Amino acid sequence: MAATSPQWASPLLVTSCFVALWVAVTWLLSYASGWVALARLYRADREAVGIPVRMRAARMGRGATGQFRNVLTLWVGTEGIQLRLQWLFRINSPDLFVPWTEIAVTRGRQFFFDYIELKFLQAPDIPLRLYGESAERVCAAAAEHWPEKKMELAAPL
């Protein structure tokens, strides 16, 4: 008797299941990280302009679900920053554009790592932390547009 592979092991079925799982997980992470909430407020309505800086390490929101390693690019321009995920991770995560007037910056240290934290005026509970050399490149690219002063964040409704 010849052994046959089970029906569920067909390459088409395995590939389909993988794609469905990828879409589902990416969709859920877009909500868990806060990207969807930011998209309601800061969805980009233009092409990315400025100096692109690929983030080696960044975190959005307060939990561990918003970790971005080598999949997030920030375009630093004269009017603000634009955030874009790589296409494989862009499901339910449209580009964001945040003007400099909507950003407050703080610096900190967690364990042995320095970071720059961006807080957004309309969504102060969804910070964006940028780590390491990439964070410093964003700061340098912004030059005189970098928000030096802390601004008063909007009071919760």
Which residues does each predicted region cover?
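Phosphoinositide-binding peripheral membrane targeting modules
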Residues: 78-113
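Short leucine-rich amphipathic alpha-helices used at interfaces
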Residues: 9, 80-81, 124
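Short charge-dense sequence patches
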Residues: 50-56, 86-93, 133
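Anionic N-terminal interaction surfaces
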Residues: 2-76
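Acidic, Ser/Thr- and proline-rich intrinsically disordered linker/docking segments
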Residues: 40-53, 102-157
